[in-house]
Amino acid sequence: MTITINGQTFYATLYDNETAAALKAKLPLSLNMSEQNGNEKYNYLSFSLPTNASNPGQIHAGDLMLYGSDCLVLFYESFPTSYRYTPIGRINDPSGLADAVGHGGVQVTFALG
């Protein structure tokens, strides 16, 4: 999967699970993602995805997760967490991700590739 942010393309690997497969079926998607906590961008989708949430304990920059059944979250910083997420995939090389997403909201395009 490709994730394009402000003209910069990142390559991501989707996990082999029901949630990732359901998201893949909806691609391509261009989303206006909002800023949260200085470590993530999120968007409440207009549809729900299957869930299998657990607490990962540690979030890594580049993680793509689902919060609840309809909130897509792209993390651009690493940090410990007590929240529960359903894993979807991960950006293979998140170098430059924090700079690409910037501060505030950002348009992000998810596509097959």
Task: Show which residues each predicted segment covers.
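Short, compositionally biased
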Residues: 75-91
